[in-house]
Amino acid sequence: MIKQRTLKRVVQTTGVGLHTGKKVTLTLRPTSANTGIIYRRTDLYPPVDLQVNVKSVGNTVLCTCLINEYGVQIFTVEHLSAAQAGLGIDNIIIELNAPEVPIMDGSASPFVCLLLDAGIEELNSAKKFLRLKQTVRVEDGEKWAELRPFNGFTLDFTIDFNHPAINVDTQHCFFNFSSASFVHNISRARTFGFMRDIKDLQSRGFALGGSFNSAIIIDDYRVLNEDGLRFDDEFVRHKMLDAIGDLFMCGHNLIGSFIAFKSGHTLNNKLLKTVLSCQEAWELATFSNASDLPLVF
């Protein structure tokens, strides 16, 4: 059978919170089968656990945030979530001594490296996939996102920026998921922001950890980072990375096709909630043999 995954050993790193600008220590711990993904705030006494599921997703305006019934929050989980989805990690305990996951370089790549350094352990329990049975679509004005039945996992994403630094030919990307392809082609794509917006956010106490080391920064004409872009279409690739992380808030890798136009955290989360609210639209699937699995990890 295709088995659930956790880590082989504990690993730790430090970084800075994107919005708080404060140092954060992140510790990843292995755990048992069917535990799921648990975030633990160790800066609180006693420590507070937040179980990842679609109901625990709170604010999605600037990032994806988890919140429990007592108002305890953890911000900016989407890049770490994407790394877990990309490597198929089902069970993990994520400890933070702050209310925010560190932004690192603005991509999921540092988290992928951390997870691979920990090693992946298979558990003696069947891995459950969320498989689409019906097409579900959500819209917000001209923006929309859709999940369709498909025997595999693909993403088809289009952004629409009228900006000299974002060429019209680089605003669409199609991605056929495999773990190796995710690591090489999606995980390295960084978040991006416009200089004018960053200054406004920082004046209001947000994006205090934003810098050229943690994002692609754009003025009205060009990319300001000295090292430029990692991919010609890095902007849309990062939007796909965000979507992979947001869709993993259900705690399962998806089997289906995701198509979106100008979608973001809010619409991605709305789509996932809409799917899960319709019992006829999805099912949990397990696989006895690797040859039957339509995804490659």
Swiss-Prot record:
It is an enzyme of class 3 (hydrolase). Its EC number is 3.5.1.108. Keywords: Hydrolase, Lipid A biosynthesis, Lipid biosynthesis, Lipid metabolism, Metal-binding, Zinc. Zn(2+) binds at residues 79, 238, 242. Its cofactor is Zn(2+). One of its GO terms (biological process) is lipid A biosynthetic process. Transmembrane segments: none annotated. One of its GO terms (molecular function) is metal ion binding. The active site is at 265 (proton donor). The keyword Hydrolase applies. One of its GO terms (cellular component) is membrane. Belongs to the LpxC family. This is UDP-3-O-acyl-N-acetylglucosamine deacetylase. The lineage of its organism: Bacteria, Pseudomonadati, Pseudomonadota, Gammaproteobacteria, Enterobacterales.
